[in-house]
C-alpha cells in the first residue's frame, strides 16, 4: 500500500522463479569476478501474463544471446561498453525494446558488476588492525603488510583477505596500484612510513593516506621535496594527517575517521574535509 510506505514511494520487485535456467550467466559472472574483470549482467524480461514474466540472463562479456533483433543487441553492447568505460559501479540502466509483432515492450536491465576495490594497509599494529576491520565492512578486498610476523598473522588480522609478511616498502612497490586501489599507511615509525609512501608517489592509486602528527608530516614533507621524491603537487594529493576530522581519540575512532575518508574518495565527492 503506497500510503503505508515510509518513503512514500512504490517499488517493483522482480522475483526469478527459476534461477537454475540462467546458471551459465552466473558461472561466467563468478569467473569474471575471480579473475578481477568487470562485467555487466544483462537481464531480459518478457511479460507472460498479468503477474508473471519470462527471465533470461547473460553475462555481457561472455556468451550473450537474448534472442533480440540484431540492431537491439548492438544497442545493448554499446550501453554495456559505456558502463564499463565509465567505471561507475552504480550505473544501472533500463532499456525498453519494442519487438515486431508483440504488443508489450521487452525490458532489459543492465547491472554493472565490478571486482571489490583493493585496500592496502601498511602496518599491522593497533590502527592497522582496526582499519582492516572497517575496510572489510565497507566491502574492500583488504591486504595488510608488515615485516613483523607477530603482528602480520590471521589471529591479529581476522578481517584481512591477504596478509603479507615482508619489507613494507618493497611489498608496496610490487603491488598493483590502479584507480581501484586505496592505500593507508599506519606503520610504527617515520622511516617505515617513508619507505611505504615513496612507491605510492605518482601512482594511479585512488587514495593515499598516511597517519602522523602535524610535526612529523611537516618534516616528511620537507624531506620528500628536498630529496626530489615528490613534487608539491604530488605531496598535496596525499591525505596526511589521515582521516576526516571528527575529534578522534581512540584507535577505533581513528579507524572510523579513516573509513569515512575512504568512503568520501570512493564516492568521488571531492577532496577530504580534513584540513
Language-model region placement:
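ADP-ribose/adenylate-binding Rossmann-like module
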Residues: 145, 182, 187-190, 198-223
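Short, structured coil segments at secondary-structure junctions
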Residues: 158-160, 203-204
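Short, well-ordered alpha-helical microsegments
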Residues: 128-129, 193-194, 217
Amino acid at each position: 500500500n503506497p500510503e503505508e510506505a515510509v518513503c512514500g514511494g512504490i517499488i517493483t520487485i522482480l522475483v526469478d522463479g527459476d534461477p537454475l535456467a540462467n546458471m551459465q550467466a552466473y558461472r561466467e559472472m563468478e569467473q569474471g569476478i575471480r579473475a578481477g574483470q568487470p562485467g555487466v549482467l544483462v537481464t531480459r524480461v518478457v511479460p507472460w501474463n498479468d503477474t508473471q514474466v519470462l527471465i533470461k540472463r547473460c553475462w555481457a562479456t561472455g556468451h550473450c544471446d537474448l534472442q533480440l533483433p540484431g540492431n537491439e543487441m548492438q544497442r545493448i553492447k554499446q550501453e554495456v561498453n559505456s558502463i564499463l568505460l565509465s567505471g561507475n559501479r552504480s550505473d544501472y540502466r533500463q532499456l525498453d525494446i519494442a519487438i515486431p509483432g508483440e504488443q508489450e515492450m521487452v525490458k532489459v536491465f543492465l547491472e554493472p558488476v565490478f571486482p571489490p576495490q583493493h585496500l592496502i594497509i601498511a602496518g599491522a599494529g593497533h590502527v592497522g588492525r582496526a582499519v582492516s576491520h572497517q575496510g572489510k565492512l565497507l566491502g574492500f578486498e583488504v591486504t595488510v603488510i608488515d615485516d613483523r610476523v607477530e603482528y602480520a598473522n590471521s589471529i591479529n588480522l581476522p578481517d584481512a583477505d591477504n596478509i603479507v609478511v615482508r619489507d613494507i616498502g618493497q611489498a608496496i612497490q610490487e603491488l598493483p596500484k590502479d584507480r581501484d586501489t586505496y592505500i593507508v599507511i599506519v606503520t610504527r615509525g617515520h622511516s617505515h612510513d617513508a619507505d611505504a609512501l615513496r612507491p605510492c608517489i605518482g601512482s594511479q592509486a585512488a587514495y593515499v593516506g598516511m597517519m602522523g602528527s602535524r610535526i612529523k608530516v611537516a618534516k616528511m614533507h620537507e624531506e620528500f621535496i628536498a630529496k626530489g621524491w615528490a613534487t608539491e603537487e604530488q605531496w598535496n594529493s596525499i591525505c596526511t594527517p589521515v582521516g576526516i576530522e571528527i575529534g578522534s581519540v581512540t584507535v577505533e575512532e581513528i579507524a572510523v575517521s579513516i573509513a569515512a575518508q575512504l568512503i568520501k574518495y570512493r564516492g568521488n565527492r571531492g577532496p577530504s574535509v580534513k584540513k
